[in-house]
A protein has these predicted regions:
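Alpha-helical substrate-recognition element adjacent to the catalytic core
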Residues: 1-108, 112-115
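C-terminal cap/substrate-recognition subdomain and adjoining C-terminal extension
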Residues: 75, 79-91, 95-205
Length: 205
């Protein structure tokens, strides 16, 4: 069974995309969209793709400066470095490859990665490329469409993890993803760090 991990808020303690938009872009926009995605009682006003594109377009700082700042701020969840050596998971993220790869390199991590692409970082604002077809289940260009074939153990925490998690055989969830799964009665295993996940996977090996 392939282990697939979300990045922001799952591997990282804090959402690194939110961090950089707050520092280099429009922090008020982050708050506005975060409130909308947290409130499960109301339909979402926009797609996740729109949120990502709009937030990142407010950043006008060159990528290398943002990466240098991020490497000083980002914190990885306890147990991740040990787990990634043992399992070599797939990292599946709505964030940008150009922001994730430097963090992995900084920590000496080798892992398979699927993420979105930054195509411009000039003074007119960052522009990105999100590939994939519209998902027939959720109606977005979601991460379900990029899951590998076969049985999946999925680990996630937020809105972008809902659809891929529900397509997986086993789910480890926290925060918003856990609340969503509770609301629809879907089974999952809660986690706080990757030591707990490693222990659960070890027991079932």
């Amino acid at each position: 069974m392939r282990l697939v991990l979300d990045w922001d808020g799952t591997v990282t303690v804090a959402d690194s995309m939110d961090l950089i938009v707050r520092e280099f872009g429009d922090a008020d926009l982050v708050d506005r969209y975060s409130d909308a995605f947290i409130d499960d009682s109301k339909p979402l006003p926009v797609t996740l793709q729109h949120v990502i594109e709009t937030e990142l377009a407010t950043i006008k700082t060159p990528l290398d400066e943002v990466v240098a700042w991020l490497l000083e701020k980002v914190e990885l969840r306890p147990g991740f470095l040990d787990l990634v050596e043992r399992e070599r998971p797939l990292l599946l993220s709505s964030n940008l490859r150009q922001l994730i790869e430097p963090v992995l390199a900084h920590y000496g991590v080798e892992a398979d990665l699927i993420a979105n692409e930054l195509v411009a970082d000039d003074s007119s604002g960052w522009r990105i490329q999100i590939d994939g077809e519209i998902c027939p289940v959720c109606g977005e260009r979601c991460k379900r469409q990029r899951l590998p074939a076969g049985e999946i153990t999925y680990v996630g925490n937020g809105y972008s993890d809902r659809c891929p998690a529900l397509a997986s055989s086993r789910i480890f969830a926290r925060c918003g993803l856990a609340r969503y799964l509770d609301s629809i009665g879907a089974p999952y295993e809660p986690f706080g760090d990757f030591h707990q996940i490693a222990a659960a996977l070890g027991r079932d090996a």
